[in-house]
């Protein structure tokens, strides 16, 4: 998965 810091460390 791509890093999605807006939700959590991994999205």
From Swiss-Prot:
Main location: secreted
Keyword Secreted: yes
Example GO biological process: defense response to fungus
Record localization: Secreted
Keywords per UniProt: Antibiotic, Antimicrobial, Defensin, Fungicide, Secreted
GO cellular component, one term: extracellular region
Keyword Secreted in record: yes
Family indicated by similarity: Belongs to the big defensin family.
Known function: Significantly inhibits the growth of Gram-negative and Gram-positive bacteria and fungi in vitro. Has antibacterial activity against S.aureus (MIC=9.6 mg/L), B.subtilis (MIC=76.8 mg/L), M.tetragenus (MIC=38.4 mg/L), E.coli (MIC=76.8 mg/L), V.parahaemolyticus (MIC=19.2 mg/L), and V.anguillarum (MIC=2.1 mg/L).
Descriptive protein name: Big defensin
Organism field: Ruditapes philippinarum
């Amino acid at each position: 998965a791509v890093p999605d810091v807006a939700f959590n460390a991994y999205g």
